[in-house]
């Protein structure tokens, strides 16, 4: 009994010294786990001999002592092999070598520089969960060697790539089954928002299918006030967007001036879908493997003249009223600097004053085409919502 008490006191005294030192040397953390390993062995032996306590120290059950000893041995051996690798010279903290982080997903590997990723389910702000994404993950291969990989975030979940294979340690689809109803979610990683991949369609009859691989370019003609040509390109440019579309929320800048439309034209002549003589944007089904990034360099509309009356660029979005309401809420919260106004949900009625209550329309107003192009470059239109760009002249009275 006395010998066990002396050994336990020696282990705990050394542990206190290591805690006070708070070293960033991996060798010190190996000594720390060696002491914990010895402490678990002493307590296990004391319980095996029938002692309920050693001095003022209560001896846990055999199962608890055995589990602590196994954990200490496992981490101690892992740290010793890590010390022999090229990462042994890196600074390490007690927290980064703790058993809590060792058992945190991804389990049984070391992790550094964690950050919080927020996932909002069903488009409801009060239905959000937080997950930890790791910047660097240290994986031990089957051969026993250590490799350092970077952690990634996509719409599908949190993952890292080792030996050209994606390894997910958090699957958002499984989380959506637990916390959501509609199987829809969006990921907020810092100032980056990743939404579910979905096709974008317009009210025109022309369809353009975009391939799912490679870098593709979709050329479109857009009506503007300058006799130029518009080119819209959609590229696979980000590895993390293979399971979703990411966009960054840009810094707010001062709005540009309004522009003027041709005299004598009615508002309906400025809506692309109602004027067959004006080229329209073909709808494009965006493959989940593509990240939509539009860059406008030219545009064409030689039929428009310059005149004193104002024409405000707009985008009409048509779809389920609830989806439009959620989209309007997200736009006001994250992208309010990318447009001037957004309407409430409105409907088109037939001659008999009936209307289709299953679909609604919202109209987004912009200062000019430049701000509208910035909006298109930044915001991903959700699934099931049709879009149509145009101009409205009555906004000068608002």
Swiss-Prot record:
What are the boundaries of the region Disordered?
256-280
MF-aspect GO terms: DNA binding; DNA-binding transcription factor activity; nucleotide binding
Q: Name one Pfam family in it.
A: PPV_E2_C
In its record, the post-translational modification comment is:
Phosphorylated.
Question: Where is it found, in Gene Ontology cellular component terms?
Answer: host cell nucleus
Q: Which UniProt keywords apply?
A: Activator, DNA replication, DNA-binding, Early protein, Host nucleus, Phosphoprotein, Repressor, Transcription, Transcription regulation
Q: Quick one: where's region DNA-binding domain?
A: 311-398
- Feature: compositional bias, Polar residues: 263-275
Q: Does the keyword GTP-binding apply?
A: no
Q: Where in the cell is it found?
A: Host nucleus
**Annotated SUPFAM superfamilies:** E2 regulatory, transactivation domain (SSF51332), Viral DNA-binding domain (SSF54957)
Asked if the keyword Transmembrane belongs to this entry, the reply reads no
Specify the superkingdom: Viruses
Q: Positions of the region Transactivation domain?
A: 1-201
A single Gene Ontology biological process assigned to it is: DNA-templated transcription
Entry-linked InterPro entries = E2/EBNA1_C_sf, Nucleotide-bd_a/b_plait_sf, Papillomavirus_E2_C, PPV_E2_N, Reg_prot_E2, Regulatory_protein_E2_N, Regulatory_protein_E2_N_1, Regulatory_protein_E2_N_2
Its primary localisation, in coarse terms, equals host cell
**The family this protein is said to belong to:** Belongs to the papillomaviridae E2 protein family.
Q: How does it assemble?
A: Binds DNA as homodimer. Interacts with protein E1; this interaction greatly increases E1 DNA-binding activity. Interacts with protein L1; this interaction enhances E2-dependent replication and transcription activation. Interacts with protein L2; this interaction inhibits E2 transcriptional activity but not DNA replication function E2. Interacts with protein E7; this interaction inhibits E7 oncogenic activity. Interacts with host TAF1; this interaction modulates E2-dependent transcriptional regulation. Interacts with host BRD4; this interaction mediates E2 transcriptional activation function.
HAMAP family to which the protein is assigned, alphabetical:
PPV_E2
- In UniProt terms, what function does this protein have? Plays a role in the initiation of viral DNA replication. A dimer of E2 interacts with a dimer of E1 in order to improve specificity of E1 DNA binding activity. Once the complex recognizes and binds DNA at specific sites, the E2 dimer is removed from DNA. E2 also regulates viral transcription through binding to the E2RE response element (5'-ACCNNNNNNGGT-3') present in multiple copies in the regulatory regions of the viral genome. Activates or represses transcription depending on E2RE's position with regards to proximal promoter elements including the TATA-box.
Q: What is this protein called?
A: Regulatory protein E2
């Amino acid at each position: 009994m006395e010998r066990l008490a002396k050994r336990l006191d020696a282990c705990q005294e050394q542990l206190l010294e290591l805690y006070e030192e708070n070293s960033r040397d991996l060798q010190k953390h190996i000594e720390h786990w060696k002491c914990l390993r010895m402490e678990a062995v002493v307590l296990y032996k004391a319980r095996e001999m029938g002692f309920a306590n050693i001095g003022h120290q209560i001896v846990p059950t055999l199962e608890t002592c055995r589990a602590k000893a196994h954990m200490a041995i496992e981490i101690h051996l892992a740290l010793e092999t890590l010390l022999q690798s090229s990462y042994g010279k890196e600074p390490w903290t007690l927290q980064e070598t703790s058993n809590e982080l060792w058992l945190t997903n991804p389990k049984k590997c070391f992790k550094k520089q964690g950050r919080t990723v927020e996932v909002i389910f069903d488009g409801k702000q009060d239905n959000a969960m937080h997950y930890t994404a790791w910047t660097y993950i240290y994986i031990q291969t089957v051969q026993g060697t250590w490799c350092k990989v970077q952690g990634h975030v996509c719409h599908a979940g949190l993952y890292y790539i080792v030996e050209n294979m994606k390894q997910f340690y958090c699957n958002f689809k499984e989380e959506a089954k637990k916390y959501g109803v509609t199987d829809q979610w969006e990921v907020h990683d810092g100032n980056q928002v990743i939404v579910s991949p979905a096709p974008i369609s317009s009210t025109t009859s022309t369809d353009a299918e975009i391939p799912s691989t490679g870098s593709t370019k979709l050329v479109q003609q857009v009506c503007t006030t300058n006799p130029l040509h518009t080119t819209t390109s959609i590229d696979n440019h980000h590895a993390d967007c293979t399971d979703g579309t990411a966009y960054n929320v840009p810094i707010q800048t001062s709005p540009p001036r309004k522009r003027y439309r041709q005299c004598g034209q009615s508002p309906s002549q400025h809506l692309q879908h109602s004027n067959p003589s004006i080229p329209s944007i073909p709808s494009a089904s965006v493959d989940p493997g593509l990240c939509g990034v539009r860059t406008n360099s030219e545009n064409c509309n030689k039929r428009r003249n310059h005149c004193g009356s104002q024409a405000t660029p707009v985008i009409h979005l048509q779809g389920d009223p609830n989806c439009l309401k959620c989209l309007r809420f997200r736009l006001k919260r994250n992208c309010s600097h990318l447009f001037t106004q957004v309407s409430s949900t409105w409907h088109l009625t037939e001659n008999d004053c009936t209307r289709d209550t299953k679909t609604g329309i919202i109209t987004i107003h912009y200062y000019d085409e430049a701000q509208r192009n910035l909006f298109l470059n930044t915001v991903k239109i959700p699934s099931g919502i049709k879009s149509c760009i145009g101009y409205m002249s009555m906004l000068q009275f608002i």
